């Protein structure tokens, strides 16, 4: 998340962005639990819990458990849509790990194996829909290129950042052809240097850059 300082909590809210007379204004709140969520951290900086909101209500919770060296060991997920807990378990072997999600009945859904080599990682996930391979390249600890390969083709995301490590542009390619982009501008920061207000732009059907979302973050510290 690229957060600075000893963060205790992070609350993210997203709104529709509206262009009006050369300016961008905030519209209705987005009812999307991937865009409106809350994170809680311990004093080591590890995420201990998340909450996802839709329509102003919490619809999904996650709790994170780490081993003695700070590596994720288990994630427990609860949702108003499940009949019980879903879990993810991790098995570590040096710079490799296996990630296994289970459904609410305890059945293993898929298996994902990830290996890191210097500034690269490769993950292979195998499940009921076949296999998917993810390859990521990093620069200064930040992902700059992510490639997803599956039976339906290849998708590539390319990331650009500002001097503070905030993403400013994401380009998307599908089977080698350009398929859109997103650009982010940051206008408000808190005392620790973390952004609290940004505008997200996307490519319209005609290829022009148009405002898409306004995102706000509320951050508390230890």
Where are these regions (language model features)?
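Buried hydrophobic residues that stabilize the cores of well-folded domains
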Residues: 1-222
């Amino acid at each position: 998340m690229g957060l600075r300082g000893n963060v205790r909590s992070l609350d993210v809210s997203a709104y529709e962005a509206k262009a009006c007379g050369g300016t961008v204004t905030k519209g209705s709140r987005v009812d999307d639990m991937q865009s409106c969520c809350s994170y809680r951290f311990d004093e080591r900086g590890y995420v201990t819990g998340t909450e996802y909101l839709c329509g102003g209500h919490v619809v999904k919770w996650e709790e994170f458990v780490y081993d003695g060296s700070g590596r994720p060991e288990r994630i427990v997920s609860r949702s108003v849509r499940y009949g019980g807990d879903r879990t993810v378990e991790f098995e570590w072997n040096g710079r490799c790990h296996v990630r296994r999600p289970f459904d609410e009945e305890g059945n293993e859904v898929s298996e994902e194996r990830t290996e890191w080599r210097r500034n690269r990682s490769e993950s292979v996930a195998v499940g009921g829909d076949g296999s998917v391979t993810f390859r990521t390249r990093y620069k200064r600890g930040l992902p700059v290129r992510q490639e997803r390969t599956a039976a339906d083709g290849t998708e590539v995301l390319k990331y650009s950042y500002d001097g503070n490590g905030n993403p400013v542009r994401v380009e998307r390619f599908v089977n080698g052809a350009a398929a859109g982009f997103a650009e982010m501008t940051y206008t408000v920061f808190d005392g620790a240097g973390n952004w609290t207000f940004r505008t997200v732009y996307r490519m319209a059907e005609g290829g022009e850059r148009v405002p898409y979302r306004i995102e706000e973050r509320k951050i508390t510290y230890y």
